[in-house]
UniProtKB/Swiss-Prot annotation:
Any single biological process term in GO: calcium ion transport
SS bond partners: none
Cellular-component GO terms for this entry: endoplasmic reticulum membrane
Protein name, UniProt field: Store-operated calcium entry-associated regulatory factor
UniProt organism field: Dictyostelium discoideum
Extent of Low complexity compositional bias: 189-231, 285-300, 307-320
Region (Disordered): 186-231, 285-320
Record Pfam families: SARAF
């Protein structure tokens, strides 16, 4: 008798376990039903897209239903729309055309948009995967001065980056040209300069150089050689430092380090920074206008005007 109860208990536990699995499998199928069903694109009349939610997908990866991909107001995260609705406006003979609307702060508006849907079997399939459409949009300022300011800031940042890279590259090139050049030429130039110095150093009376060449050379070598601590050893070919010494008379690699070149580059860099900052402040601090509310654009940073307005933009359909 006890054995029969034990068998019944095992059957009951197994039934509960299997029923739980069936319920989970049914719920899983329902959750992915949108990814398995197809619909004719031209029959879709309205798309309601929400921020932070993902699309369904069958062949590719899901995408965000709404994604900002640029525009002059792309940094204004708090002004992003929460919902966008797109309405089927008919076909242009190639694909469905959409009008997308969103409720936004009056300081921004929708720019260029792109409605993207997943083709059911292939990208250009007339049928799409249900709930697979998303919208990529740009967010623009409605105020012309702020729009120009954002464009100028972006352009200035790129110019500064390019200038800094070029400036650093020029410095590195000059350093490698200075320190990495072979020292054989410098040594030969130094030897020639030493010979000229020994022959022409004022050690006697004018007119006696031809007759007393040997005496002058011996005298110069004895009196101005490396043994005299007050005068550098011109015949020493081993430089104290790791870089080749500058050749003031030969016009060699040392020309890179002439003060005029680096002073000019530094001055140009500082002038460019000052000029760009001045333009930046000029754009972001426009003179007050009595034709618009003071609360809309009182400063360069934007927290929005607090006034909502409807914004719309038009798009075709891209496939993935």
């Amino acid at each position: 008798m006890k054995h029969n109860y034990y068998i019944l208990f095992l059957i009951l536990i197994s039934s509960l376990f299997l029923s739980n699995k069936v319920v989970e499998s049914y719920g899983h199928r329902n959750n992915n039903k949108g990814g398995d069903s197809k619909i004719l694109l031209k029959d879709v009349q309205v798309l309601t897209l929400r921020s932070g939610e993902m699309t369904k997908a069958r062949r590719s990866s899901p995408i965000q239903q709404m994604e900002c991909i640029g525009g002059t107001a792309t940094k204004e995260l708090e002004l992003y729309p929460k919902t966008i609705q797109c309405y089927n406006m008919g076909s242009n003979g190639v694909d469905v055309q959409w009008k997308c609307e969103a409720t936004l702060d009056s300081t921004v508006r929708l720019g260029t948009i792109d409605v993207s849907c997943e083709g059911y079997s292939y990208p250009e399939d007339p049928y799409i995967t249900a709930d697979s459409c998303g919208v990529f949009y740009q967010l623009e300022y409605t105020n012309e001065q702020r729009r120009k300011a954002a464009l100028a800031e972006e352009e200035t940042s790129w110019v500064q980056i390019i200038f800094c890279i070029a400036f650093i590259g020029l410095i590195l090139y000059a350093v490698f040209n200075w320190c990495g050049s072979p020292q054989g030429d410098d040594d030969s130039n130094t030897a020639q300069n030493n010979t000229a110095t020994d022959n022409n150093y004022p050690g006697g009376f004018p007119g006696n150089n031809n007759n007393n060449n040997n005496n002058n050379n011996n005298s110069n070598n004895n009196n101005y050689g490396g043994n005299y601590q007050g005068y550098p050893n011109l015949n020493n070919n081993n430089n104290a430092g790791g870089c080749a010494q500058p050749n003031n008379g030969g016009g060699g690699g040392g020309g890179w380090f002439q003060p005029g070149l680096w002073t000019g580059l530094a001055s140009g860099y500082l002038f460019g920074r000052i000029h760009s900052n001045r333009n930046h402040h000029h754009y972001y601090n426009p003179s007050p206008s009595y034709n618009r509310p003071r609360s809309s654009y009182s400063s360069g940073s934007s927290g929005g005007s607090g006034i909502s307005s409807s914004s719309s933009s038009y798009s075709g359909t891209s496939r993935r």
